[in-house]
């Protein structure tokens, strides 16, 4: 009997393929390490629409609310492009985030030494890179009211509202400082306090939270435009970057390209603690459903595997096991194993999705 519950939502496109490799790793932890999980599986996105006419059923939503963690593969694809907006596959993902109130989006950007030459930047700038961007996910300009397009006089006007409350900023700040304590004890908060009132409030609240509870963590502030420049100029100066929804959306994609491949990038979205002390949580690879390679065995499963490693660390407090899994991934890459997305100009023979999963399991067992 285990007290660790996990809901798997493979989704669409390459989602089921990469999730199958995570299943191998879950099975290995159970058989080799005695660390078992109560795993259930359900449909989301286009797969749920095909079966039920909606991208996420109420029953699946209820299940997601009750487990310790949700692990999602990918949603969407061209087959669903003409659906009504309300039932598009992506609406299932957005409903999960909204109803679980997953306000802290964690986007790591880590460059394994074996892949440093795949970055668009010089090896010496990115080799050894390991930063974490915490993006506030449920407020800000994407959600603020009023919003919309209307007519004033003879022209159309588009309006979006950047709005943050103290509570929304403070809970994101707490998450960032707690995260830094697990890492290298540094937080850089990014906003535009020089031109935006929401940025002024953001900086004030972050300072207040820091002064009250996290004096041991080094805090700095940076305007977000300078932050984007610094991510490209000298990314290794950062540990944890804390920022709002809009800037986080932009900065995390910028940081993603420092690492060489979207197929390598995991993410976590965390909410408030549940009764058992574990945060509500959903983990997913950053990459999409990749319909162009679906069913061909070409997908890179590493982002999904590293998303499970994040679940081990942040939902199940199994940091040593997360490090073991991340080390296995790094070791496989150091040995030269590459899926198609990681093939360099010198060519070579890529391995399949399944072969990559098998290689990582073999390293875990070594």
UniProtKB/Swiss-Prot annotation:
EC number annotated for this UniProt entry: 1.1.1.85
Cystine pairs: none
Enzyme class per UniProt: oxidoreductase
GO (cellular component) term, any one: cytosol
Keyword set includes S-adenosyl-L-methionine: no
Site for Important for catalysis, residues: 142, 192
Annotated cofactor note: Binds 1 Mg(2+) or Mn(2+) ion per subunit.
Cofactor: Mg(2+); Mn(2+)
InterPro entries reported in the protein's UniProt record: IsoCit/isopropylmalate_DH_CS, IsoPropMal-DH-like_dom, Isopropylmalate_DH
PROSITE patterns given in the database record: IDH_IMDH
Matches recorded under HAMAP family: LeuB_type1 (MF_01033)
Name of the protein this chain belongs to: 3-isopropylmalate dehydrogenase
Top-level taxonomy: Bacteria, Pseudomonadati, Pseudomonadota, Alphaproteobacteria, Rhodobacterales
Gene from which the chain derives: leuB
